[in-house]
């Protein structure tokens, strides 16, 4: 190990001087004698390297001795990490003792080559009606949950983990990137109560941590997921929240003195996003299905951060504040959400026709809303009145009680199979349920529950 000393400290950015013949490589991990880990970001010349601190730089002083580990950050991987909470360096933070891993992997790795990659068109059923119908997920695909503050990204993600972990019984890795510590705590207890904790590895780098931790914690989680994939498993990789990953990159970029680009983001935004997203892929050995929550600043989907993320995804689930304000949860916008899987060759003709029919009716209702607002319902033709009635039923039928929200809604969660979902919406489109009041469609599971509820109204 070669040793150097700290020559400058500016917040999370630390300059370390090494002998000219032993300058560390970019991304090497350095250990300060106080126990803090640094990651090399730039070589400034003259034996000086500029590093980002992966932890608080409080109490550091110039002249402290720094050792070069000659490797990037190495984190524990494998089944020993299941049921445990670790930080960006792979150190356990759940007070359950050492992990006792057999193997450690570097967090900086190259993406699988073209020959190794595979694409599948197998669908992954989530049990959430609106998602399975409008924006179905592919096994080994990438899904983005887009939404502003407080429209339900984390709750949707927790429901997906619960449903898929229980129904699909595979391993999951959850990376909490720059989110609230309270959510991390809720999440841990939710997994524990659902008895799926022994199938989930949790990696947390929360809001209160320095930007270096928040920037690298996604890579730590991804490295653990890659290990499971390379063992031939189908893994689920959840990231909450990709926007905070971008934001940490912006902070690090500014600290390193790079010129900002559009809206103050780092000039390397697209490249940083690409490096992460290209590694989240399925190979011929195993698959990684990823679900990523993406915060949309000021509800503006054209902001560079969400816009850069869009390009990498197979399915986009857009959560809308307008739908949430109607009390319809999950607040998924059926007209804005898309999926590459919604193709008759993949999902079958019936599913495709029903999904497009639902979108068609909702689009027509959206156009009629202006007329209704000015002239009232009575001025509509009989045909349009029918469209409005069916659209309102569809809107309500797209809502669903969640297992993870039982505490708030007071009604038990529902898992709806794809077959039941298609049957229900097909019936509404064909007018089989025109005689049933629209209130019966609100917050239920399958169409059979609607009929049951209507009897008691």
From Swiss-Prot:
Pfam families in the record: ATP-synt_ab (PF00006), ATP-synt_ab_N (PF02874), ATP-synt_VA_C (PF22919)
Coiled coil: none
Compartments in which it is found: Cell inner membrane
Source species, domain of life: Bacteria
Entry binding sites for ATP: 147-154
Gene3D superfamilies: 2.40.10.170, Bovine Mitochondrial F1-atpase, Atp Synthase Beta Chain, Chain D, domain 3, P-loop containing nucleotide triphosphate hydrolases
Keywords: ATP synthesis, ATP-binding, Cell inner membrane, Cell membrane, CF(1), Hydrogen ion transport, Ion transport, Membrane, Nucleotide-binding, Translocase, Transport
Entry's Gene Ontology cellular component terms: plasma membrane; proton-transporting ATP synthase complex
InterPro entries assigned: AAA+_ATPase, ATP-synt_VA_C, ATP_synth_F1_bsu, ATPase_a/bsu_AS, ATPase_alpha/beta_chains, ATPase_F1/V1/A1_a/bsu_N, ATPase_F1/V1/A1_a/bsu_N_sf, ATPase_F1/V1/A1_a/bsu_nucl-bd
Reactions that this protein is recorded to catalyse: ATP + H2O + 4 H(+)(in) = ADP + phosphate + 5 H(+)(out)
The keyword Hydrolase belongs to this UniProt entry's keyword annotation: no
Molecular functions (GO terms): ATP binding; ATP hydrolysis activity; proton-transporting ATP synthase activity, rotational mechanism
EC class name: translocase
Entry's EC annotation: 7.1.2.2
Main location per the UniProt record: membrane
Membrane topology listed for this record: Peripheral membrane protein
NCBIfam families in the record: atpD (TIGR01039)
Subunit text: F-type ATPases have 2 components, CF(1) - the catalytic core - and CF(0) - the membrane proton channel. CF(1) has five subunits: alpha(3), beta(3), gamma(1), delta(1), epsilon(1). CF(0) has three main subunits: a(1), b(2) and c(9-12). The alpha and beta chains form an alternating ring which encloses part of the gamma chain. CF(1) is attached to CF(0) by a central stalk formed by the gamma and epsilon chains, while a peripheral stalk is formed by the delta and b chains.
Assigned protein family: Belongs to the ATPase alpha/beta chains family.
Function: Produces ATP from ADP in the presence of a proton gradient across the membrane. The catalytic sites are hosted primarily by the beta subunits.
Identification of the protein by name: ATP synthase subunit beta
Source organism: Haemophilus influenzae (strain PittGG)
